[in-house]
């Protein structure tokens, strides 16, 4: 009875019940591998960013400040788009979706990393690692397709302005946005289960600050070459489709802008497109390095730096790009800041 109590308290009731089921299985070795991968007996160890830093406390504070800036910047952008009627257009609807993804994206990795540093813990259980991997891959995939959708929206707005309200009505926007989230979740449901079912080495030290797919795969003690080829092909497809949409959209946009008579119209179109292209280059460039370059180009240190760039810095930069260079957003922000004191004065 004491053994039962100990097992229940140290593995969790779900794992304890699964152990009972495994005793009746015909494949004991497979069960041992599954238990080692999925219970708390052998947690992963995240070596993280702070291990090699000369000033880990300062780095922790900087990342925390950046995290707060990302959350507040994207939250303010979503609030402005929701509250200002002039921003109730398809373009700003997709920008609000991008901000929502960025808030979730940075929240998947940074809070766990900071909490571990403060608590002096660097372990993560296999289920937690799998959940982190799933949400990370899902959000990254969703953002790939959302950036392509935003490029298509700009193409319709600039090249077919008269048909724009019909082609990009509210129902179409909801459908496209839902499709981006769905396709991203397909990536998560595809890569996460396969990656987490590989048998891992005894050390289980992940040379990263979160459970990124390539970093976890490096721990596998079995041949992953076939899966890596499959993952590479999926990434090529996942990147190729949005890149084709973005490239063709902006090619047609440039041709349309070239034929415009109004200098003001050309300037506004260039400003809108350049903001989006900046975000595309930042996000896609980092993704291509991580998932498409050969392993000879990779080192744990380089991978972590690139991951810091597109998991921590990009969510901070995006709202700045779409707000500071956008007169409509800045106008809505000024209106909100001026209305608030006037409202308080009227209440007094």
Curated annotation (Swiss-Prot):
Broad class of where this protein is predominantly found: membrane
As for what it does, the entry says:
Odorant receptor.
Q: Which organism is it from?
A: Homo sapiens (Human)
Q: Under what name is this protein listed?
A: Olfactory receptor 2T4
State any single GO MF term.
olfactory receptor activity
Pfam families named among the record's database cross-references: 7tm_4
Q: Which cysteines are joined by disulfide bonds?
A: 129-221
| Intervals, Cytoplasmic compartment | 82-89, 153-171, 252-268, 325-348
Signal peptide residues on this chain, from the entry's feature table: none
Origin organism lineage: Eukaryota, Metazoa, Chordata, Craniata, Vertebrata
Q: Which residues lie on this side of the membrane: Extracellular?
A: 1-57, 112-132, 191-227, 292-304
Q: Which GO terms describe its cellular component?
A: plasma membrane
The UniProt keywords, alphabetically, are: Cell membrane, Disulfide bond, G-protein coupled receptor, Glycoprotein, Membrane, Olfaction, Receptor, Sensory transduction, Transducer, Transmembrane, Transmembrane helix
